Each structure stands twice: as C-alpha cells, then as structure tokens.
Amino acid sequence: MNYLSIPPLAFASSCKKIGVRYSISAAVVAVAFMPLRVCAWGVEGHQVVAQLADAQLTPKARAKVDQLLSQEPGQTLVSISTWADEHRSPRYAPLHYVNFPRGDCVYQAQRDCPDGRCVVGAIHQEAAVLASNASPEARLLALKYLVHFVGDVHQPLHAGFHDDKGGNTYQLQAFMRGSNLHAVWDSGLIKHLELSADALSSQLAGRLKPAPWTPEIAAEESCRIVSTPGFYPDRLVTPSYIEQYQPVMLGRLALGGSRLAVMLNDILGR
C-alpha cells in the first residue's frame, strides 16, 4: 500500500483535544493541525509509538522489558519514550535524525551517517547493546534510546534534507501564527486532535500487518515522503494540506509503534 494513500480512520465526534530485519507495513487515519515545539514527535507522538509497541510485546519480551524497567520503579515504555529528549545534549543531538541531500533518498552510510552518528546508526548501536550481555544499567539506557529513536526515524522530517535542517528553517504560517515545517510535523498535527496518547493509540491499534524493515528502510521512507511534490506548502498550512498529509502522519506513528514492537520482540523475546 502506498503510504501516501492511507484510508482515513473516522475519529469520534468528541475528538478535541545489528543488520536484523524487523517487520511491518503501512496503515491508517486522519487528523488536524496546530504548530508547537520542535523535538521529534513531541511528547504525545512518542507516547503513542511506545504505547502501540507495548500492546504488541510477546510475553517473553514483556518480561524482559519489565525486568529492565524495574531498576527505576514506576517506569514504563511510555514514560521512558521521551527520556532522550528530556536529557538531550549537543553530543547526542545528531543521533535523533539523518539528513539527505535534496533529491537523493538512497541511504549511504558513509555520506549520511559518518561514524554512525545519525538516527539510523544509533538504532543499530542501541539494539546491539540491548541484545548483548552488557550490564542491566547499560541495557536499560539502550532501551530508553531505542524506544525514542525508532519513533524519531518515522517522523518524515527527521530524515529530511541538509539544506533546511529537516524543515527547521522553512518558515511558514499555521493557524494565524508563525511556525516552521518541522514543528508542524513534530507536534502540531497531533496536538490539534486534543486526544490523549491512550485515546489516539486506541484509534491506531491493530491496523498493521508485518512486513520486513530496517532502520535504513524507515529513513528512506521518511525522506521519500518529504520529497513528495506539495509536501512543502507555499508558506501557509491550508486545509487541503492537512487533508492530504494527515493520514501520512498518523500512518507513520502507527508504523513506528508496530516496528518498535517487532524489534523488541526479536531482541528480547528469544
């Protein structure tokens, strides 16, 4: 299925506010818009990805996730999903994204991710730590990063273009206020729904079928979405833009959640 032609899901009328291949295919839904902060999917988006993944863990994987999380009582996959943004630093900032040359969405590690310093490399690195015999502390840290980075790579503009820093420098107007395209995709489209992460996760749950994937595949998918004619609006986010891209945004959230579950089940469910 073309991930730019995902059938919309009707929301309730009350809606307001390692080289391993993992699996999943495209899916789902509809949404509206309002611009906000710039930090990957924002809190709500990362929580949705984590909650969708949590619901799809196998018993063995869940037991190992719970064992790792027990080092910090009260933590869940959802609560750790934003840890990497809350503890962000200049050193780790490049691990949240990968930038492509405009017009070329074929991932080349040497060009796009030197020394593994991008979100694709970071996913592989953290997955390797999680699968290793490292200390429980190191594996919990890897889990925190992995939950977050898998969400990041499914936000299209976290695999955007060098020349505008993934849409951060592309200024526009959205709902009578200044913003940038990266912020629109990070949080704006989700925030305008005024749905909790629980409610949005319920809307997205159970709509995907497994299919092979890798972090490289996810990054190239995101880049191709950004490369779609019309993805960059003419400095104004219009209702027609929202109508065209709202299913894409929620489809990426759903893909991120399902793919994260597949990855965790593969690593921890053995």
Where are these regions (language model features)?
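Intrinsic-disorder/low-complexity regions
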Residues: 1-2, 84
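Bacterial N-terminal signal peptides that target proteins for export
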Residues: 3-26
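Hydrophobic alpha-helical transmembrane segments of integral membrane proteins
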Residues: 31-32
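N-terminal signal peptide c-region/cleavage motif recognized by signal peptidases
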Residues: 35-37
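N-terminal, motif-rich segments that launch catalysis or mediate targeting to/interaction with membranes
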Residues: 39-149, 156-270
